[in-house]
Amino acid sequence: RSVSRGLGDVYKRQIKGNVEKGDNGLLAVPSRVSEARDALQQAFEYAKVIKSKNIHAMAGVTDLSTKSLVTFIDNLKFAKELVKDSNIGLVIEPLNLNDNPGYFLTRVEQAKEICELVGSDSIKIMFDFYHVQINQGNVINRFEDNLPYIGHVQIASVKGRCEPDRGELDFSYIIPEIYKLGYKGMVGAEYKPRTTTDEGIAWMDNFK
């Protein structure tokens, strides 16, 4: 009932930059503001076409300087104005450093502070239990503490980022719990199938 199968809830591919050259987002990279804003505008147009509710505004690989932080905030403020007359929002996602070395945004609390500094209900956190467990742990308490700022949830197994039916996190407990806490959005599953997609999708039977 609550696990998303569709593409409409989050659209997130158009702000990664040039993946072949090592990009993993652009919005916090001071030298690429123009490119980041062009990508935001393109993502916004695509999101309107596919009726997406959210755009994933990826920070990118950069240092933790004040300049990078200001760049990220300024680009998000630009994005805030871009979407203000639409039903489309933006999500920022803390990623784990094991899989994403050098990524700017790595902690849920850091993401919350950025949301506060941007000052818009259209900017929310994408809370990916896989990344949060690896980087920080204490996932349920951390989710509850930041719930007003969470706009989307993703799940996958820890470790391996495979189907969310085994590993360190028990999603048969976690998913009902986040709704008890007051979360009202969708839960997306972003993972690498252990075998094939068709064989792996059986895990969803436990979440109907």
Predicted regions: what they are:
Residues R13-L27:
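Mid-chain, structured segments of secreted extracytoplasmic proteins
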Residues S4-R5, A47, V83, I178:
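A generic structural signal for well-ordered alpha-helical segments
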Residues R1-Y11:
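Short, small-residue-biased leader/transition segments that mark boundaries at the very start
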Residues K16-G17, A59-D63, P94-N98, F129-H131, ...:
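Active-site-proximal loop/turn and secondary-structure-junction residues that shape catalytic pockets
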Residues K51, G89, L105-F127, H131-K208:
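Histidine-acidic metal/acid-base catalytic patches
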Residues L7, K16, A59, R166, ...:
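Short glycine-rich loop/turn motifs that provide flexible caps or phosphate-binding loops at active sites
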Residues S4-R5, G22-L26, K67-L69, Y103-L105, ...:
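Short secondary-structure transition/capping segments
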Residues D23-K124, I134:
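Active-site acidic/histidine proton-transfer and metal-coordination neighborhood
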